[in-house]
Each structure stands twice: as structure tokens, then as C-alpha cells.
Design a protein with these regions (language model features):
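Periplasmic c-type cytochrome electron-transfer domains
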Residues: 1-77
Length: 77
């Protein structure tokens, strides 16, 4: 979903709620909170905690360090 130069495919999708939502770009994601269609992630880190769902990518195989590194990367976009 988050591909290309702005890290979005600009597609409207159903994230399991029955509603349609535009895939937002990841560029600037560190400055746009809360995150997700329902605002469940107050921070990027929350995406990997209480808001983690398979509909937003599988993170089960990521280590704690992988997640920390990914959060640091996302904050640079």
C-alpha cells in the first residue's frame, strides 16, 4: 500500500470496517497523529502495539530492535 516516491498507492481500501479510506502517504507520518482511520495510534510506536492488526501489515516476525529501527526510519520520512 505504501509504495512509490510518496509511500502511497493512492488507492481507496476497506480496512475491515466496511468503509472506504484513502491510503495516506508515509511522508511526514511522524508529524501526523493520531494515525489510522480511527485515530487509535497516538504515536508511530502505537502502530506496533495496541493498534497492530494484520490488515495493516504483519509484524509478528519483527524483533523489538526491528520495530525500533522501523519507527526511527518512519520518523525520518
Amino acid at each position: 500500500c505504501h509504495s512509490g516516491p510518496k509511500f502511497t498507492n493512492n488507492v481507496t481500501v476497506d480496512v475491515g470496517t466496511g468503509g472506504a479510506f484513502q491510503v495516506p502517504p508515509l511522508v511526514g507520518v511522524g508529524w501526523r497523529t493520531p494515525l489510522f482511520h480511527d485515530g487509535c495510534a497516538a504515536t508511530i510506536a502505537d502502530r506496533f502495539g495496541s493498534c497492530a492488526t494484520a490488515r495493516h501489515g504483519s509484524i509478528g516476525s519483527l524483533s523489538t530492535q526491528d520495530i525500533s529501527d522501523l519507527i526511527a526510519y518512519l520518523e525520518t520520512l
